[in-house]
Amino acid sequence: MLLPSFPVTGVATALLLRNAVHASQPGSSVQKARAYDRFSSRPTRDHAPRVQSSNTSTYRFWNDKTKPHLVESLPDVHFDLGEMYSGSINITSHRNESRSLFYIFQPKIGEPSDDLTIYLNGGPGCSSEQAFFQENGRFTWQPGTYAPVINQYSWVNLTNMLWVDQPVGTGYSVGTPTATNEAEVAADFLEFFSKFQDLYGIKNFRIFVSGESYAGRYVPYISSAMLDKNDTTHFNLSGKPAHPLHHLAPTNAVCTGALLYDACIGQWDWVQAELPAYPFVQQHASLFNFNETFMTSLATTYEECGYQAYFDEYFTFPASGIQPPKYMNYSECDIYNAIYNEAFSPNPCFNPYRVIDECPLLWDVLGFPTDLAYEPAPTTYFNRADVKRALHAPQNIEWELCSTDPVLVGGDGVSGPEQVGDDSPNPTEGSLPRVIEATNRVLIANGDWDYLIITNGTLLAIQNMTWHGQLGFAAAPATPIDIRMPDLQWAGVFDAQEGYGDLDGPQGVMGVQHYERGLMWAETFQAGHKQAQDQGRVSYRHLQWLLGEVDSL
């Protein structure tokens, strides 16, 4: 997540918003068996690296055209990658300058699938290699760990996966940024996606669009542009609801849809950050550990600047009415940045993406795991020449996790609702309702440890959105998300320690869900800005719902 619109002070805060977005005996064999029975599609549990055949004759998408894109191995990844492709695809040039978007494509493991799930990171300008390498790809290399390992909760266990560096100016993409709005971003993406499908011979697939953080703007606009094409051969996002409008309910029919994590969907700086900031600190008081004097000043600011009254009036179920527009207040009422700056006093390693974190900063192969860069450090993984060669990436690109230059250039990169050069209206004002109404299968989820995009702020944005003729949710979310899948990622660690072998059981209640009129809401416990990284089992369930494999979370 990037969104560098807040004025902040000091070296540490200069990087603000850079990367951007129970059973009674859970270890018993009976409980494990029951949990396994609940999942018809689940990761395969093994403790040694899984190895797929390197014989390309078994690869579904390998042909003479895709052969140059095949990834045979990656540095420091000491197991067979299976079928995997990456590279650049050209899009329309601008002023005689070539432009291209970079992608990584991992086909589904096991039984073939005609589902294709796109995943986009946010920023604007943050590379989707982040999600590929640390969130939902086939393997993962987490901060502070020695080497990459198989990701037991990888989304490639369920669907073909496509990660894309976009818009132009992001990651390994090539060209000078020209987009001033989401329509232009979507046009470039659809051109890329059409060429990608032609390259791999993909037709008549169900398409799912997902992403996190600022991709809360990308995903609805790209999805809406796909719907505009009215072309189910290449852009089958609309699906066919199995129920009449007045009986809408989740269904495993042919519906497709979209998934948004910790997403910028409303007026982010005010509704999803500034307004809910103080209640967030109250909820997590022991983590922030502010002194009594500072907490008293926050309470005074929250009331005197009108935040309390606004929140009380509009954070209601059902919605009390259309919320009047508000914008970031940089005066003495700037409560969000006051909290952000003060947080570094009790916790010098404060991480707004995951407020549970403390010092030391863990070395991250992607460069920095928080707002603070880790220095000195080795070359970032995706900036290594050998990694670029393996991925068929441009050698002359200086890869950055999040671009330091604008990738959206409206008003010289500072116009639009979020002041980042994106002139399009907020998704809640049109594109997001349109996708919900067309698919009846959209999931919006927020992690409870995320200070960048706060859970109740996202809910407040939903309460200001009209879809299927009604404003917001009629009832407050209250249904628990009970994860019965046993632990798969760390089971080997438990099993290797005497006396710990039965502790890798189901998680139990890991969040709250609510479904109305085609929209599923999920609050995820013990997760920050990157839910798939923090809570792989919960994220896996989210994807199962999106694909229609389960009716609830």
From Swiss-Prot:
Keywords: Carboxypeptidase, Glycoprotein, Hydrolase, Protease, Signal
Top-level EC class as recorded in UniProt: hydrolase
Disulfide bonds listed in the record: none
A GO BP annotation: proteolysis
A molecular function (GO) term: serine-type carboxypeptidase activity
Region span, Disordered: 27-55, 412-432
Basic and acidic residues compositional bias, start-end: 34-49
A Pfam family of this chain: Peptidase_S10
Highest taxon of the lineage: Eukaryota
Signal peptide: 1-23
Pathway the protein takes part in: Secondary metabolite biosynthesis
Active site positions: S213, D450, H529
Enzyme Commission number(s) from the entry: 3.4.16.-
Role: Serine-type carboxypeptidase; part of the gene cluster that mediates the biosynthesis of aculins. The pathway begins with the synthesis of 6-methylsalicylic acid by the polyketide synthase (PKS) acuA via condensation of acetate and malonate units. The 6-methylsalicylic acid decarboxylase acuB then catalyzes the decarboxylation of 6-methylsalicylic acid to yield m-cresol (also known as 3-methylphenol). These first reactions occur in the cytosol.
UniProt similarity note: Belongs to the peptidase S10 family.
Full protein name: Serine-type carboxypeptidase acuI
Lineage: Eukaryota, Fungi, Dikarya, Ascomycota, Pezizomycotina
